[in-house]
């Protein structure tokens, strides 16, 4: 294979985008020539550009115009002509007709894939990180249908994800590969560096005997930020006499309406000194490496990177069943899996771990071991390169 075209939806610091970044680094190490098309920018853009050329999809000149202006332009066919010119310019810049293989990262990227008119002979690999909720939020049915119809091989991050695309979208299971890319050596190094940094909670004024229950992820309903606060209320209420007060820290909540709503709940629940919302930061591991328990409150998460980060920090995970692929890794020895949205059960398991330090250590260490056993980075990249070679030879 000579040239690989990668398509991503943006460069925000989130799970799928970080996986793509790690993938690009490993592919570059294999000498693969790449170009990346992004639907939008973000904090990771410079890191992407350090690996390969990056093209941001251009916006229409009149995209910010008033609705009436757009309607008039549409009737005159101006926008349609602009779109055609833009598509052709992007195709020429990417030299689409000479690309050997296309890798589409996330179904959201199907929007830009559909505008490129990729030649029928070019194999397409789609790396899916989304389940039902995210598919409905971040993709359109016709764009997803087109993407899946052109997909030669589907990379699914978990069994739950593979099952969803097979049974809800009729994708051929013989063309689905279970694939999770975690750059475990780099992540282990980053964890080590984070642990060597000064205790960030001391600078926040936490008591030295505090136990930290952590959450991490974007601020959105799907991630269960609201459930995290309810969980904190239950745990604190059931553990009033503890000599080790539990503090709840969620990393990844930016300023905005949702943050304001969450802070209102926190204040009204009397938890202002126990629940702490941290904005998105590249220093996630400084917080996570000192968590005592990680709770995945997501209503849906296919196979989130944060669970791998927690595991390599030797932090046990408590998550919901039927909310994605995390139970496949956590199982019965890396933490606890509780019934979907059962916060009573989740709070009981969290308290169990907080009260039993040896159990915390045993489960956290075992979770880290399973990650290293099941997801070695070298094997993962070799699997992908072999797949690329097979598809480009057909």
Question: What do the PLM-derived regions correspond to, one by one?
Answer:
Residues 56-57, 149-167, 171-195:
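Donor nucleotide-sugar binding/catalytic pocket of nucleotide-sugar-dependent glycosyltransferases
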Residues 280, 299:
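Aromatic "clamp/platform" in nucleotide-sugar-dependent glycosyltransferases that forms part
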Residues 104-110, 128:
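Short His-centered aromatic/hydrophobic patch
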Residues 37-43, 183, 216, 245-261:
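Glycosyltransferase donor-sugar binding loop
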Residues 17-22, 211, 215-237, 260, ...:
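A conserved mid-protein helix/loop that constitutes part of the nucleotide-sugar donor-binding site
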Residues 260-279:
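Nucleotide-activated donor-binding/catalytic signature segment of Leloir-type glycosyltransferases, i.e.
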Residues 345, 352, 359-374, 380-386:
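A short, well-ordered alpha-helix in the C-terminal region of glycosyltransferases
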Residues 316-320:
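Short hydrophobic beta-strand element within catalytic cores of glycosyltransferases
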